[in-house]
């Protein structure tokens, strides 16, 4: 409880990845574990703008990680991971153990772990200022930076009358007794099944039957029409504004329905709530046509709001991760949103532009830096990265915010392209 309200306390994705890596190794999936460790190193390199040796750091982290798994503490964590019982305290202990074993990992681990929480607190605060334009006060989330002794965590207020947006968008396509998580798990089992999976033959047969039922064209058409009817009747206010503002703040894979909620507003219209805003990852202003997969940027949407529907629903913006293994369902969801909400995208882009035009960027960057000041009392913690590196990343993020804040303001008040 914080301020008399129930909150969910979380650590960031980097520590979560350490826990996931332990779980992968407990299942014998060493390559998957190495991949997750690589994500952490990649995050450090991104935040420090290449100022670390990625290959050497990856090797150090991998060696320290597997050495940790051979310790009594590591074996204990692996046993807990087998049953999905790892908690925040556990992943923090894994982090501490790795740094204690190899102090050279203090900065490469500490920077992404620290900025997981700083960036969430700062970016969520910014997005909340926009969400005040269409959400009632009790539906605006928060992400408060917590600094218990020698640690940094995020506390997010629970919104009990909201439901996950991914559940809301997909339920019309699923049998009543099947959750989205169960459907995704079935798809994952089918995809990863070996040709001679005789031991799981019955389970796989059930999974394939479920997927065939979901992907049946009749079911897909019926689900799409049900979603179209719901959206036309009750709307989905804030969807495009949420997608756009998170895009301007540099989000990538976290930009999608699995990081949003939906609630019924006082006017009985559905409202989207953005939660777990990571932010400050990439400069996503420009399109990236040379990527292996084309990626839209936010610049053209700001300059030409009429393009918003196509751009913001493109898979390079609205992630399909929420429907992993259910591509046909995602395709129908996109079609339904496009048909039902085609007149909503452009006005919501204008709302985001007006919000940026009124944004006090200097105050916003000062607020971002103040989050770093909250952590000065933790400088003696063994995992904390060097203060100079923390200031370097704060300056990077402030620069990103300054750049984003300037362009939309020009587009609102200046000549139109």
Where do the model's predicted regions map?
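Conserved ATP-binding subdomain of kinase catalytic cores across diverse folds
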Residues: 1-191, 251
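Short amphipathic alpha-helical segments that mediate assembly, nucleic-acid/protein binding
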Residues: 18, 61-65, 70-78, 86-91, ...
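Conserved aromatic-histidine-acidic binding/catalytic patches
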Residues: 32-37, 115-119, 227-236, 246-247, ...
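Conserved kinase catalytic-core segment
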Residues: 42, 46-49, 53-54, 121, ...
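Catalytic and binding regions of secreted/periplasmic enzymes and modules that target cell-wall glycans
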Residues: 129, 179, 215-232, 243-250, ...
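A recognition module on extended beta-rich or small alphabeta surfaces enriched in W/G with H and D/E
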Residues: 166-181, 228, 295-309
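Active-site-proximal segment of zinc-dependent metalloprotease catalytic domains
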Residues: 189-199, 240-246
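C-terminal catalytic region of ATP-dependent kinase domains
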Residues: 267-415
């Amino acid at each position: 409880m914080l301020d008399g309200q129930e909150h969910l306390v979380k650590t960031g994705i980097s520590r979560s990845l350490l826990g996931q890596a332990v779980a992968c190794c407990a299942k014998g999936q060493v390559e998957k574990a190495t991949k997750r460790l690589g994500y952490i190193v990649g995050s450090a390199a991104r935040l420090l703008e290449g100022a670390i040796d990625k290959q050497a750091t990856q090797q150090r982290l991998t060696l320290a990680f597997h050495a940790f798994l051979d310790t009594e503490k590591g074996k204990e964590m692996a046993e807990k991971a087998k049953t999905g019982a790892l908690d925040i305290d556990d992943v923090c202990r894994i982090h501490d153990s790795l740094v204690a074993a190899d102090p050279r990992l203090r900065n490469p681990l500490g920077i992404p772990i620290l900025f997981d929480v700083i960036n969430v607190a700062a970016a969520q605060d910014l997005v909340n200022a926009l969400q005040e334009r269409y959400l009632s006060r009790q539906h605006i989330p928060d992400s408060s930076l917590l600094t218990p002794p020698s640690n940094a965590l995020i506390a997010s207020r629970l919104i009990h009358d909201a439901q996950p947006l991914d559940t809301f968008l997909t339920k019309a396509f699923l049998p009543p007794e099947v959750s989205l998580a169960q459907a995704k798990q079935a798809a994952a089992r089918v995809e990863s099944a070996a040709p001679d999976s005789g031991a799981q033959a019955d389970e796989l047969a059930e999974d394939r039957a479920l997927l065939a039922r979901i992907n049946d064209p009749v079911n897909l058409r019926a689900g799409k029409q049900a979603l179209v009817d719901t959206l036309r009747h009750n709307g989905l206010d804030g969807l495009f504004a949420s997608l756009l503002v998170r895009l301007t703040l540099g989000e990538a894979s976290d930009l999608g329905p699995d990081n949003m909620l939906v609630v019924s507003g006082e006017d009985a219209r559905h409202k989207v709530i953005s939660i777990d805003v990571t932010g400050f990852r990439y400069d996503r202003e420009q399109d990236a046509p040379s990527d292996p997969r084309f990626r839209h940027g936010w610049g053209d949407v700001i300059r030409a709001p009429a393009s918003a529907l196509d751009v913001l629903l493109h898979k390079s913006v609205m992630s399909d991760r929420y429907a992993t293994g259910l591509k046909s369902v995602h395709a129908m969801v996109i079609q339904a949103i496009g048909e039902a909400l085609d007149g909503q995208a452009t006005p919501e882009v204008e709302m985001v532009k007006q919000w940026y035009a009124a944004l006090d960027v200097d105050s916003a960057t000062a607020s971002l830096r103040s989050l770093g000041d909250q952590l000065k009392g933790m400088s003696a913690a063994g995992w904390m990265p060097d203060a100079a590196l923390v200031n370097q990343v704060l300056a990077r993020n402030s620069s990103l915010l300054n750049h984003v804040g300037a362009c939309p303001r020009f587009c609102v008040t200046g000549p139109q392209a």
